[in-house]
């Protein structure tokens, strides 16, 4: 199962200036995130207080193309950095293979 550590950042130049519009946009995106959590695409998500940035943990059998499609739903308002991660067991397996 692939796991991803994703950092995200809202583009402040694209965020609505009006607080009501900005709140509506945030709510829409938060509901999209909640749906991804319910569907198992995202296992954890958080926003850094007062920064317009945060992180997400994704896991599953989702292909990179499908992950990219999901992230494109937030474009151009949010940018992402995606890092595929290994478990400690995978690191141990890699380490042992290096000693062969």
Regions found by a protein language model. Give the residues of each.
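Short S/T/G/P-rich N-terminal loop/turn motif that feeds into the first structured element of a domain
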Residues: 1-53, 62-65, 92-100
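An amphipathic, aromatic/His-enriched active-site/gating alpha helix that lines ligand/cofactor pockets
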Residues: 35-36, 59-93
């Amino acid at each position: 199962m692939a796991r991803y550590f994703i950092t995200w950042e809202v583009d402040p130049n694209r965020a609505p200036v009006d607080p009501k519009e900005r709140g509506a946009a945030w709510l829409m995106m938060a509901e999209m995130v909640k749906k991804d959590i319910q569907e198992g695409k995202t296992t954890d998500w958080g926003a850094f207080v007062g920064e317009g940035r945060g992180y997400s943990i994704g896991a599953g059998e989702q292909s990179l193309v499908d992950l990219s499609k999901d992230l494109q739903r937030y474009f151009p308002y949010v940018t992402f950095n995606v890092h595929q991660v290994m478990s400690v067991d995978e690191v141990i397996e890699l380490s042992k293979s290096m000693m062969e």
